[in-house]
């Protein structure tokens, strides 16, 4: 599996669902980012609803887009 060099993991809360499995997420520091679901979450049919607390991976190159990698229970 590929190593995750330089990714930033941060907690956030889903604000609204968008088309094509995209979500608007408000991060713990107050920023709002556009995030999509990671492939493994999609494969295991993990549903994400507004209000869910999630972990988002951000690339250091584009801090406005991210990938949702975990949903808290």
From Swiss-Prot:
Subcellular location as annotated: Cytoplasm
Boundaries of every S1-like domain copy: 1-73
Record's GO cellular component terms: cytosol
UniProt subunit comment: Component of the 30S ribosomal translation pre-initiation complex which assembles on the 30S ribosome in the order IF-2 and IF-3, IF-1 and N-formylmethionyl-tRNA(fMet); mRNA recruitment can occur at any time during PIC assembly.
NCBIfam families given in the database record: infA
Domain of life: Bacteria
GO molecular function: ribosome binding; rRNA binding; translation initiation factor activity
Matches recorded under Pfam families: eIF-1a (PF01176)
Function, as annotated: One of the essential components for the initiation of protein synthesis. Stabilizes the binding of IF-2 and IF-3 on the 30S subunit to which N-formylmethionyl-tRNA(fMet) subsequently binds. Helps modulate mRNA selection, yielding the 30S pre-initiation complex (PIC). Upon addition of the 50S ribosomal subunit IF-1, IF-2 and IF-3 are released leaving the mature 70S translation initiation complex.
Protein keywords: Cytoplasm, Initiation factor, Protein biosynthesis, RNA-binding, rRNA-binding
Name under which the protein is recorded: Translation initiation factor IF-1
Lineage: Bacteria, Bacillati, Actinomycetota, Actinomycetes, Acidothermales
Similarity annotation: Belongs to the IF-1 family.
